[in-house]
């Protein structure tokens, strides 16, 4: 009896080990697919000049009491550089403005204005609570069809995957202008986010908030609060 029980336990352990290995392989394959599916759409600022997108979409990140943190400031600088080069005359800044106390998008818009971009050319997406929400809302709220996304290179892989799978004609310009604190931790989190968003894109739920259309070819001050 004891011998049979041990044999059963051994067989179960082998099956669980095989299942775990298969799950790890599947997740690794999903991660690699998301990372590589649209990496050929990561382009240089010079290449962006040829595309005539509806807007330049700058994705949010941490803001401090004094304004954008280093990572977000570099995203903004890269997006503003593209704007001033004539890639597009519309900026869409998308981030978290879920509370009065924390507001990424007004900090982003103010920064862009301080760097010479007219207020009416800057649209704020106050409900860009995730990369998925930002892309979905760019398409459905701001009526964007073709877009240049500006964010860190490691974030562009997932951003471009989501955007293109949602039907946007999306390209990306990286904003890697310097080393950042906790870079390794952020990149590990990004691996998990790629896997999560693979399944989210497959289901395509609505974002946290939608709302009435605000066409990107209108006046950005319509998004002021």
Predicted regions and their residues:
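A structural signal for short, hydrophobic/glycine-enriched beta-strand patches
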Residues: 29-188
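General helical structural elements
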Residues: 7-9, 79, 162, 193, ...
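Short linear elements at protein peripheries
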Residues: 205-225
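A general structural signal for short secondary-structure boundary/capping elements
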Residues: 99-104, 171, 193-200, 217-222
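N-terminal type II signal-anchor transmembrane helix
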Residues: 3-46
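A transmembrane-helix-recognition feature enriched in membrane-embedded lipid enzymes
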Residues: 187-209
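Residue-level signal for alpha-helical transmembrane segments in multi-pass membrane proteins
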Residues: 23-33, 57, 196-203
């Amino acid at each position: 009896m004891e011998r049979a029980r041990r044999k059963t336990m051994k067989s179960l352990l082998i099956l669980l080990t095989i299942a775990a290995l298969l799950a790890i392989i599947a997740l690794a394959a999903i991660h690699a697919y998301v990372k590589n599916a649209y990496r050929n759409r990561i382009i240089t600022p010079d290449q962006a000049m040829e595309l005539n997108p509806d807007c330049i979409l700058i994705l949010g990140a941490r803001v401090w009491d004094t304004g954008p943190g280093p990572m977000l400031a570099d995203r903004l600088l890269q997006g503003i550089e593209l704007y001033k080069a004539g890639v597009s005359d519309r900026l869409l800044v998308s981030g978290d403005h879920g509370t009065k106390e924390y507001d990424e998008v007004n900090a982003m818009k103010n920064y862009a204005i301080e760097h010479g971009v007219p207020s009416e050319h800057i649209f704020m997406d106050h409900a860009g609570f995730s990369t998925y929400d930002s892309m979905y809302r760019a398409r459905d709220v701001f009526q964007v069809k073709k877009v240049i996304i500006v964010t860190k290179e490691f974030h562009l892989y997932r951003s471009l995957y989501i955007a293109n799978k949602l039907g946007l004609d999306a390209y990306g310009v990286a904003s890697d202008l310097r080393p950042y604190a906790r870079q390794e931790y952020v990149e590990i989190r990004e691996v998990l986010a790629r896997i999560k968003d693979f399944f989210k894109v497959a289901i395509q739920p609505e974002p946290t908030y939608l709302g009435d259309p605000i066409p990107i070819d209108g006046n950005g001050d319509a998004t002021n609060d």
